[in-house]
A protein has these predicted regions:
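Glycine-centered tight-turn motifs at strand-turn-strand junctions
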Residues: 539-554
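Proline-centered linker/hinge motifs at extracellular inter-domain junctions
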Residues: 245, 377-387, 469, 497-498
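Contiguous beta-strand segments within globular domains
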Residues: 39-40, 256-290, 388, 392-427, ...
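Short, solvent-exposed loop/turn segments at the edges of extracellular beta-sandwich modules
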Residues: 352-357, 475-481
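Glycine-centered coil/turn sites that cap beta-strands in beta-rich domains
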Residues: 490-534, 545-546
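Aromatic sugar-binding surface patches on proteins
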Residues: 309-332, 338, 444-460, 550-554
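Cysteine-dependent hydrolase recognition
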Residues: 1-319, 323-332, 340-342, 348-350, ...
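Short beta-strand elements
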Residues: 354-383, 484-495
């Protein structure tokens, strides 16, 4: 078997766009801790289709392999059966929104096991072709879809899988995918081999996607492998970091051979190193480290009485500096931990801000439990330094569009609570005192680099009815002191965006120019038209573009 990839293009314009997309991915300009994140999604089953929990069990085996053999990655599990189904709409809204957020935040790999077709994943339409064509996220995952017909490239109609690849700036960089009807049990060994070959190195180097496909098919004799194909450039390698990372000390104590506990309200200082493939310190690595510390695993009982082990509760997400290959960061363990005295997990990512070289690692030689004897006293809740919708000119009672963008800037000397492990201590936005319009913002909070105790939460509010609304924003610190801010606003349907400024760079251009439009519609679907005129009023250029706007930050 040869490592062949396919570009399902029909026009010269598509060919140009896909080549540019591949070049951009290979140049590795989009660095970030998203490269440590993977998602395994599994369909549910029923007595009528004969699968029951089979899709979830297969996905969990794949996730378990990565967690065991490649613990430097963070595995996100979206198993339908662990979520409540909307029986009226026939879908899983929390799975749907969870997948959209994971894709937006960034995934290195998205893997799906279950039913599917040419226009959607699963009968519940958790992901549809319409969704795919509206993708605007810039972190490009590799997709693996163990389903039916998702990428039927030889049909006159363009399939959903093709659109994942053909999205010129979003979607995915490549797909290991099916072109015909497939079956769950024969699909699993194909999916399993793809995952193993993606992450296992060949003589110390990452395999190209073509080599992954070749190695996968050459180890299988099943005729069902003929229905799997690679959509994308076979010369591309999945863009996970090359360097490794290790923790050397916790609170000045060597991690080798010592028992380490993370106790509630204890201040923890972690030190470590960036290492090359031979285990040597990379002395010229200087940049940023992004640690994520997770509480102990919990067992989630699903609706059909099967279980999954997951790590939904976060102790700390932060950032600090790396200098000459060595890093250090400090945080305080929240009061709301599991107290399980079971193993936790620390995930590490770092990037050299000069060279763009990346590193990743993990540390799990610690347990989570107990309470510190030296905890500091703090009875004051977090300070809400700024709170607004869409932009900083917002005033209480102001008018906004139907999908306003909520922003709050926070500070707390001890730290903001985002653990999600205790009822009543989540960061929440509650609109009109409605449970339907109540949003958990824990995962939308991020610490600001170089700002001790300062962070920001940014959340795109789903569509609201026109009229006046009241909202409450609740936030807690890690000692469970709370702060609440109440504000009002009026939703006006059809409210026009306000354009603050248009900046062209460079100011004097001969060949090309980039236009930056500053407006008050962050994270909104927009259609933008730009016309360029000379001093005599003659139109020189005209362009229209549709997409989702970014968030302008001073």
């Amino acid at each position: 078997c040869l490592g062949i990839g396919r570009f399902p293009i029909r026009t010269v314009e598509q060919a140009t766009q896909m080549v540019d997309k591949v070049i951009s991915y290979m140049e590795n300009k989009n660095t970030g801790s998203w490269k440590n994140n993977l998602c395994f999604m599994a369909d549910d089953g029923s007595n009528t289709d004969g699968f029951m929990t089979e899709h979830m069990e297969f996905a969990d085996q794949l996730a378990g392999y990565v967690e065991s053999e490649h613990p430097e990655f963070l595995v996100n599990k979206l198993y339908y059966d662990a979520y409540k189904k909307d029986m009226t709409a026939g879908t899983y809204p929390d799975v749907r929104s969870g997948l959209q957020k994971l894709l937006k935040d960034g995934l290195l790999l998205f893997n799906y096991t279950g039913h599917g077709g040419t226009t959607a994943l699963s009968d519940e339409k958790v992901l549809t072709q319409t969704d795919i064509n509206q993708f605007t996220y810039t972190h490009l995952p590799v997709w693996v879809t163990a389903t039916c017909d998702f990428t039927r490239f030889d049909d006159l109609n363009t399939s959903a899988g093709e659109d994942v690849f053909l999205n010129k700036s979003s979607g995915g960089i490549a797909l290991f995918t099916t072109v015909r009807v497939a079956y769950s049990r024969p699909n699993f060994p194909i999916n399993d081999n793809v995952i193993r070959n993606l992450f296992e190195r060949n003589n110390g180097r990452r395999r190209t996607l073509g080599e992954v496909m070749q190695a996968t098919k050459n180890t299988l004799s099943s005729v069902y492998k003929l229905g799997f194909c690679l959509i994308g450039d076979p010369a591309v390698k999945m863009a996970y970091p090359e360097f490794g990372m290790k923790v050397t000390t916790v609170n000045g104590q060597s991690v080798d051979g010592n028992s380490i506990s993370f106790k509630a309200l204890e201040k923890i200082t972690v030190e470590g190193e960036v290492l090359d493939a031979s285990g040597q310190l990379v002395t010229d690595f200087t940049g940023i480290v992004n640690p994520t510390v997770k509480d102990s695993k919990v067992t989630v009982t699903c609706l059909k009485n099967s279980n999954k082990d997951d790590s939904p509760n976060t102790i700390f997400i932060g950032n600090d500096s790396v200098r000459n290959g060595k890093f250090s960061f400090t945080f305080t363990v929240p009061k709301d931990i599991s107290y399980s005295n079971l193993q936790g997990k620390m995930n590490l990512y770092a990037v050299d801000t000069e060279s763009g070289n990346e590193a990743q690692g993990n540390f799990d030689n610690f347990i989570v439990g107990g309470t510190s004897d030296t905890a500091e006293t703090d009875t004051i809740g977090p300070e809400i330094r700024a709170l607004y919708l869409n932009d900083t000119t917002f005033v209480d009672g102001g008018q906004v569009n139907t999908t306003p963008y909520f922003v709050a800037e926070l500070w707390d000397k001890s730290g903001v609570n985002i653990t999600g492990s205790s009822v009543g201590h989540d960061m929440m936005l509650v609109i009109d005192e409605s449970t339907v319009l109540s949003y958990n913002l824990n995962s939308y909070y991020e610490l600001l680099p170089g700002e001790d105790g300062t962070g920001i939460v940014k959340f795109p509010i789903p569509a609201l009815e026109p009229g006046k609304h009241t909202a409450e924003f609740w936030v807690w610190d890690i000692l469970n002191n709370s702060t609440v801010r109440t504000f009002t606003f009026e939703v006006v349907e059809g409210l026009k965006p306000f354009l603050f400024d248009v900046i062209a760079t460079p100011g004097i251009a001969r060949e090309q120019v980039t236009f930056h439009l500053m407006h008050n519609r962050p994270e909104s679907r927009m259609r933008v038209g730009i016309m360029v005129y000379d001093l005599a009023g003659r139109q020189l250029w005209k362009h229209e573009e549709s997409g989702t706007s970014g968030l302008f930050e001073n």
